Amino acid sequence: MRLRAGFEIARPAAVVWDELCADDALHWCRILNDVRWTSPRPFGVGTTREVKALAGANLLREYYFRWEEGHRHSFYVKETTSPLFKALAEDYLVEPRGEDACRFTWTIAVELTAIGKPGKPVNRALLKTLFTDTARHYGLTPA
């Protein structure tokens, strides 16, 4: 399952990038309860992060395999407590659109386990709330 959303944001790319890398990154996403970097700054390839989701029911340990400072980073989940996901990866791309605007493209790719496949529509809906919440955070109309 692959989901992608693009957001045209009326903020400089550097501001959006800093938010995505902040200590409280993604605090606006309802299904994420705690996002904690487990690597020291400055971040780069090899950075790790832990995320608690769904009221702490799911813990994800993420490993960043791509880091292009100020522009793009990508990670895969190296460990999760959820029996529903066989693999999960995300890519964040921030592209300037002039001095005071940017485009943020967020891609999520998930491979469900045999147990998770019957719940694909529910999993898709839950993951899409990340996009809806992000649109609201940036003052955009959710798609």
Residue ranges: model-predicted function:
Residues 1-41:
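Hydrophobic ligand-binding cavity/cleft-lining segments
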Residues 3-9, 92, 106-108:
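A structural signal for short, well-ordered beta-strand segments
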Residues 9, 81, 110-114:
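Beta-strand elements of well-folded, non-transmembrane domains
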Residues 16-20, 25, 49, 64, ...:
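Hydrophobic pocket/interface hotspot
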Residues 28-31, 54-101, 109, 140:
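Hydrophobic-ligand binding "helix-grip"
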Residues 42-47:
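A short, glycine/Asx- and small/polar-enriched loop/turn
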Residues 103, 108-143:
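A conserved amphipathic terminal alpha-helix motif
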